[in-house]
């Protein structure tokens, strides 16, 4: 990857279908047969907690090859406070450009812009092997629990990063993925019919 061979900019309405197609191609048959992420993106844009000022696309040679979005969320602290944070994603890179540094470049740019926007911290689900390289740690190390996960269960997927140093100092509590990320699968199926047909496959490693 050459840092001069791509640009990152804000998404515009003219990009919506290209971005949804990108997400569909990137996530298809990865976590489940087919995917929901393109419909999640479609729905998030009309949610009041969606942050359009932090909805990014990465372009290379005039083609959108990556995207990332941010959504307002909160931690329910054990003392009863609601601590405003953000969550992130879907984030993806076109399959043919994965593992070449573009994903980390997009992620690091996005995090820098989210910090400048005033986000204090970020919680979301991801792989520490990738996101740890951009400053994420296990949320449990911050005293943050994942809603609905029984004590003692593996929470290594649940990650956190402070964007304002010390933002979570003295806070323990629970995080729940915003409801806007949960979509009706029959509605997602209907939405998917707007795209060219793709075969859904049950593959090893899928989690749904």
Regions found by a protein language model. Give the residues of each.
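Internal, conserved structured core segments that host functional sites
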Residues: 54, 58, 89-92, 119, ...
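Conserved acetyl-CoA binding element of GNAT-fold acetyltransferases
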Residues: 80-95
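Conserved active-site alpha-helix within GNAT-family acetyltransferase domains
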Residues: 116-120, 126-153
